[in-house]
Amino acid sequence: MTLREMIDRLLGRQQASATTAKHRLQLVLAHDRSDLNPDLMEQMRREILEVVNRYVELDLEGGDVSLETEERATALVANLPIRRVRDDVLPQVPAVQ
């Protein structure tokens, strides 16, 4: 997310339809280039949330894990609003396969 997008979001401004379409196209291209199927992407998202949630309490409604592409690089981006830092780290839960 760019600084301009973050400011627009904080001020409640709506994105132009061209900007929204561009972002969606970038997301589709990132998924295509990464060669990750949707099930694997969902599994990664769940595991990332589980690990981060051991250390901090998350606002899962406002969170997002996605692939983003800028120029020729694809990045896995996690935008996870933190409610509070946990006093004690939660124990690791064995992954269900």
Swiss-Prot record:
Keywords: Cell cycle, Cell division. The keyword rRNA processing does not apply. GO terms for biological process: cell division; regulation of division septum assembly. Gene3D superfamilies: Cell division topological specificity factor MinE (3.30.1070.10). Prevents the cell division inhibition by proteins MinC and MinD at internal division sites while permitting inhibition at polar sites. This ensures cell division at the proper site by restricting the formation of a division septum at the midpoint of the long axis of the cell. Belongs to the MinE family. This is Cell division topological specificity factor. It comes from Synechococcus sp. (strain RCC307). The lineage of its organism: Bacteria, Bacillati, Cyanobacteriota, Cyanophyceae, Synechococcales. The gene is minE.
